[in-house]
């Protein structure tokens, strides 16, 4: 009897899950855009059934007041300050060999690489707030003008997660959907990220891969 009840509940749950997916704009758009030769539909179905999916209404509010719209005088105060300079000097002293190794391989000025790492995440101190999935999911549903862009990025993100065996809800990033210490959007991560330490995985929070990816982006 218990088994029968459980079976009925399971069938009902799967039925409603299917209906909710068919009505989900994000699911529909991602299904259209994702490379199904790389990512099977069954994987997409599984991801969109995750109970951790949610929309964050704070995200449209953040877009309405972006840092990038500030004047240079305001913007400068966020980045050129004593604490960030100290963090940069400390990071350089601890990672000097790696920085020059990356610089030599890609023929990119080491201090440009360092500066970008400082601007994008303050050397790994400021890089997250929302899961990448939920950020892009929210943009699709709550920001119609960004839906096309966000669905392309969500498709790119799921391609990365599938290839590298990463839980899509495990990575946090900015309100815009950029992630990792280099703050790449998913399509750029797929295009420019490198496995600099040759461990078989492109890791957005490991400095060898991060610095290598930043340099590769600049080449």
Tell me what each language-model feature is:
Residues 183:
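Functionally critical loop-and-helix segments that line ligand-binding/catalytic clefts
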């Amino acid at each position: 009897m218990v088994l029968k009840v459980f079976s009925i509940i399971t069938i009902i749950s799967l039925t409603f899950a299917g209906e909710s997916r068919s009505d989900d704009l994000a699911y529909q758009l991602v299904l259209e855009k994702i490379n199904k030769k790389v990512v099977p539909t069954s994987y997409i179905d599984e991801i969109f059934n995750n109970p951790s999916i949610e929309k964050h209404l704070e995200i449209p509010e953040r877009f309405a007041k972006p840092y990038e719209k500030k004047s240079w005088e305001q913007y400068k105060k966020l980045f050129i300050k004593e604490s960030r300079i100290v963090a940069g000097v400390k990071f350089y002293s601890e990672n000097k060999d790696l920085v020059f190794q990356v610089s030599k391989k890609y023929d990119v000025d080491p201090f440009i690489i360092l500066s970008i790492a400082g601007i994008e995440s303050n050397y790994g101190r400021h890089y997250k707030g929302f899961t990448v999935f939920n950020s892009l999911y929210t943009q699709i549903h709550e920001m119609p003008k960004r839906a096309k862009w966000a669905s392309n990025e969500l498709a790119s993100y799921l391609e990365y997660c599938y290839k590298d065996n990463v839980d899509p809800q495990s990575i946090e990033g900015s309100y815009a959907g950029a992630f990792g210490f280099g703050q790449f959007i998913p399509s750029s991560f797929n295009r420019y990220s490198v496995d600099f330490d040759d461990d078989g995985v492109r890791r957005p929070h490991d400095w060898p891969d991060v610095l290598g990816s930043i340099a590769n982006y600049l080449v």
